[in-house]
């Protein structure tokens, strides 16, 4: 009974704020597209220089000279947790709203640029390499970032209404409690994504590189 009630509340919440969630998704996709455009706007020299460093990285992976899995996990978890934490903090500040949107756009840009560069330099091989090295962890990370950004925007808008519209009667505290719980859940999911990035993706990447003779 409680589970069904929570599901109904969640569905009602998403319907109520569907326009914000849609805007956040579109903004992220715009970042991805812009990242791919940036790749196409690079000069041949810039692409060659960047691909040289990428080739060095490929060689390190094949030779097993990359960081230990535990170190990769710590780096990934710290990086993504900082990003999520920053978005969460910006959500409780009135002036943080535009920064949240900028950060999400940048995240999309990075993903679009990374995939776009691999495809532009290696074609189908680059796509397959991106599929095994970037996609697995981002199947968790991207939805978490999008959800956290949307909830931060919603909470920030509530703060603005509470501050500037005295007729706004909804209490902030219940929303803030849920906001904290959402952040905790996001961190748990980020830890799972970091585990995939540290222990699964490197093996998949090395296997794919051996298969593709990179």
Outline where the language-model segments fall.
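Perimembrane loop-to-helix junctions flanking transmembrane segments
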Residues: 48-70, 212-213
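Terminal transmembrane helical module of multi-pass membrane proteins
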Residues: 148-214
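Cytosolic juxtamembrane amphipathic/interface segments immediately preceding
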Residues: 3-21, 166-174
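Hydrophobic alpha-helical transmembrane segments of integral membrane proteins
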Residues: 103-136, 178-196
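Interfacial helix-start motif at the membrane-water boundary
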Residues: 59-88
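N-terminal signal-anchor transmembrane alpha helix
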Residues: 14-47
